[in-house]
Amino acid sequence: METFPRTIFDDVHQQFRSTFRSWLDNEVVPHHEEWEKAGITPRELWLNAGKQGFLGLNVPEAYGGGDTDDYHFAAIMAEEIGATGVIGSANGITLHNDIVLPYFLGLANEEQRARFLPGMVTGEVIGALGITEPNTGSDVAGIRTTGLKKGGAFIVNGAKTFISNGINSDVVIVVCRTDPEKGHRGISLLLVERGMKGFERGRNLDKLGMHAQDTAELFFSDVEVPAENLLGEEGNGF
């Protein structure tokens, strides 16, 4: 019996907690040490999480998601990941759900939603957010990566570092300067996809902890990103 019982979780939340904890105990905990040594989790884990409904709980049902904006579920996932000691192995899932997906839900147009969200719910498409840079850290106003317009595309050049999900990711929201003359008002968000020419991944960085969370360097050399991969309005990335 809890000394100070919490009242913020109802029966549905607690049922979800039990289901998620069981999944962690059976599918993640037994492999955690192996993945920590490997420095990455297998893509099969993502597909498994998607199959169980643990990805995209906040995504509309039309795209296969859980269609709920109830933050309690995210809180429960964070609590249970911490309680089982598998933060390195499961942190990428919370990043995908709670940091990357809200960008799509808040800024993506209908074509982008239809193209990316179903796969992000099933685990076939893993997301990452590219802000931090080697020389500027996470100072968004000071980023140096550029995405200059050329015809019907943006040409991206620059580098990012310490990017969580950097190795596994299939789509990266890259914060870059599309108009260097406008300061922070010239910053935009571009969706850079796996396989685009000139997009390379560097080292999977060796960290002090959370080793199974792949954290990488990303390099962009004249990457041609089509205009339809602009997320939100041009110049509103800051």
Set out the residue ranges of the language-model regions:
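Intrinsic disorder at enzyme termini
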Residues: 1-12
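Glycine-rich phosphate/pyrophosphate-binding beta-alpha loops
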Residues: 97, 137, 161-166, 210
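A glycine-rich, basic-preceded beta-loop-alpha segment at the flavin cofactor/substrate interface
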Residues: 194-205, 214-238
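Hydrophobic, small-residue-rich alpha-helical packing segments that form membrane-like cores
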Residues: 136-139, 154
